[in-house]
Amino acid sequence: MDIRAAEISAILKDQIKNFGKEAEVSEVGQVLSVGDGIARVYGLDNVQAGEMVEFPGGIRGMALNLESDNVGVVIFGSDRDIKEGDTVKRTGAIVDVPVGPELLGRVVDALGNPIDGKGPINATRRSRVDVKAPGIIPRKSVHEPMSTGLKAIDALIPVGRGQRELVIGDRQTGKTAILLDAFLNQKAIHDNGPEGEKLYCVYVAVGQKRSTVAQFVKVLEERGALKYSIIIAATASDPAPMQFLAPFAGCAMGEYFRDNGMHALIGYDDLSKQAVSYRQMSLLLRRPPGREAYPGDVFYLHSRLLERAAKMNDDKGAGSLTALPVIETQGNDVSAFIPTNVISITDGQIFLETDLFYQGIRPAVNVGLSVSRVGSSAQIKAMKQVAGSIKGELAQYREMAAFAQFGSDLDAATQRLLNRGARLTELLKQPQFSPLKTEEQVAVIFAGVNGYLDKLPVAQVGKFEQGLLSYLRSEGSAILDAIRTEKAISDDTKGKLTAALDSFAKSFQ
């Protein structure tokens, strides 16, 4: 048989040329032990911290503990179907989520998968969940107002775009209600405001009941606010890693708007539950516990998350991400570990009290303990003009009210101060789902600090406010427009507003 070398080499070359590239090299390891949502894996020598790994059946996990002989992996899902000896595959990707405007109006889990039954999300961009916060140079100091629509907050504890303002209080004091009202208040700007002022909303529900999240979504949908909102839900029945990851996923989605010259508002509801799930993961991974059994890096967990809320400078597109983290206290104890941590990280706190809530002062904001470290730079001039005096008067009222309980014979000046304070406190009450535009708040507070309420019985203040708003919307719309466009109360506007108030006060019975 005649073998020709040239023919053989031609055949071999042909075979090599058409050789399929189906062979795929992937680094695999084996499960040594699994339980409580944690798997110990042997053999993933080159895995990165925070990398996604894949178990049989498509279940995903994240490598957190990189030890000399094994890797501690937290599992995003049920660990029931994973058993000892299973192969674990590296994906080569750090945990990321879809981002972009395609997510608006949707409810997703902590990995960005839709859970609202409205079909897939066709997002083209993805972003890592845990990225470094912007440095000092790309930032700009907070100077634009982020209006919540609540008089007590916008006048006394103003929040600016790019600020982190903590909402803290016991259970059932209206913390989520403040977030919800802030979201609903953005509707007017979205419907007919300039593109550059629109504020996109992101709500992260951590460890909440599903019914609570469903109710939140329902209210947003009914009031037309879901179209500019993204909901990330890691409910109480979800595994701890999902609850730990959800705030970071939500932050990545909010950062898309910040980095593209837009504005976003994110509410984390709440970070106490995220800390608890992180503690659970850390203890199961055998990391050493610290105070209240939390791991040593629980401060870093929250600081690296909240530092990502920022106001960018003009070179970076002037976008912003405003954060409203929520912390639940036990018995008004703000000196516990997690509350003190988050208070020290944020730029101020809105402190809600059970006693005020049951007295009917809602939103139940304790104005004495609440503070905004950005202050009046996050207010328009018109609001500064009226809110400056209300702060002082309420502070004096709180001081006097404590002493007034003991003595009955009060001089006229003290009596006047107490009367004014009681009426201003009444004026700051506001029913849920009824946020006010800034110009309407300015007009109402102007009436309060200029003595228009002093002659009224306290019980009539709410009725007077409703009547005044209706009157201004119909008869005095030019005054409201002037306050909105000029962003200040000029002498001319002040004269017109005073005349309108005089006219309304005469007719009010």
From Swiss-Prot:
One of its GO terms (molecular function) is ATP binding. It comes from the Bacteria. Gene3D superfamilies: 2.40.30.20, ATP synthase alpha/beta chain, C-terminal domain, P-loop containing nucleotide triphosphate hydrolases. Its EC number is 7.1.2.2. NCBIfam families: atpA, PRK13343.1. Belongs to the ATPase alpha/beta chains family. It holds the Pfam family ATP-synt_ab_N. InterPro entries: ATP_synth_asu-like_sf, ATP_synth_asu_C, ATP_synth_asu_C_sf, ATP_synth_F1_a_nt-bd_dom, ATP_synth_F1_asu, ATPase_a/bsu_AS, ATPase_F1/V1/A1_a/bsu_N, ATPase_F1/V1/A1_a/bsu_N_sf. Produces ATP from ADP in the presence of a proton gradient across the membrane. The alpha chain is a regulatory subunit. It is a peripheral membrane protein. Keywords: ATP synthesis, ATP-binding, Cell inner membrane, Cell membrane, CF(1), Hydrogen ion transport, Ion transport, Membrane, Nucleotide-binding, Translocase, Transport. It comes from Rhizobium etli (strain ATCC 51251 / DSM 11541 / JCM 21823 / NBRC 15573 / CFN 42). PANTHER family: ATP SYNTHASE SUBUNIT ALPHA, MITOCHONDRIAL. It is found in: Cell inner membrane. It catalyses: ATP + H2O + 4 H(+)(in) = ADP + phosphate + 5 H(+)(out). It is an enzyme of class 7 (translocase). F-type ATPases have 2 components, CF(1) - the catalytic core - and CF(0) - the membrane proton channel. CF(1) has five subunits: alpha(3), beta(3), gamma(1), delta(1), epsilon(1). CF(0) has three main subunits: a(1), b(2) and c(9-12). The alpha and beta chains form an alternating ring which encloses part of the gamma chain. CF(1) is attached to CF(0) by a central stalk formed by the gamma and epsilon chains, while a peripheral stalk is formed by the delta and b chains. GO terms for cellular component: plasma membrane; proton-transporting ATP synthase complex. The lineage of its organism: Bacteria, Pseudomonadati, Pseudomonadota, Alphaproteobacteria, Hyphomicrobiales. This is ATP synthase subunit alpha. The gene is atpA. The record marks S370 as: Required for activity.
